[in-house]
């Protein structure tokens, strides 16, 4: 097995996701420190873990992940501040006034981003905002209370104030395989930038099936790079399970290998200033 560190093969940050329980596994920690330069919290920085029912916050596991990154000279990436799938009870029961809800959301974002100021190189501020069918932005607790652009404004402005140096992202998936979703995502980005939302980067979750047509990743990254912002190729995995691919397992695995290579080549072809991280 080739043991060459992955981080030595790329001129840009190469990242890995982690859950706090893995930090007690010496084989995992050795592998992570040897091969990667960026660490993303897979779960313990999400609202469903951080926010208690009474509205208080817990940072124990996020702190452990941050300490691991700091002690090994790795960048920390915060994932994720606002996600439609996380609607904590403490937020859902707030009164209906916009001011009350905006204040609570800004307080949460400020607490999270401020706690890791100077260590977190970036944050997924709002995660997966577009409907799967590409028909437009998702309906969520946040958009219902504050409006589609409004909830971006509250969250991004609070994050920017809490850490002016951190790169602030929105992030979504299936952009390579669903042209309508990519188009809707790009329209939202245009709207946010026009409204003055301090969006600093674009996340492209890269959950792929091995039968994805060749060239789709490259076309997607090229389209997103047209905004001139840093690109985070995030959450990369290539499944060989869907679409009857297991009928030809060997062929699916060859295609899987090819897609990983295409993703790396497509990211490497971006202007250097737009290569935020490959994870």
Give the role of each language-model region.
Residues 2-63, 78:
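N-terminal pre-domain/capping segments
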Residues 34-52, 61-175, 238-243:
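Substrate-binding cleft and catalytic face of glycoside hydrolase catalytic domains
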Residues 24, 122, 189-191:
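Short, functionally important structural connectors and interaction interfaces within domains
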Residues 3-20, 29, 67-70, 88-114, ...:
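Non-catalytic scaffold segments within catalytic domains of secreted glycoside hydrolases
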Residues 59, 156, 272-274:
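Aromatic-residue hotspot detector
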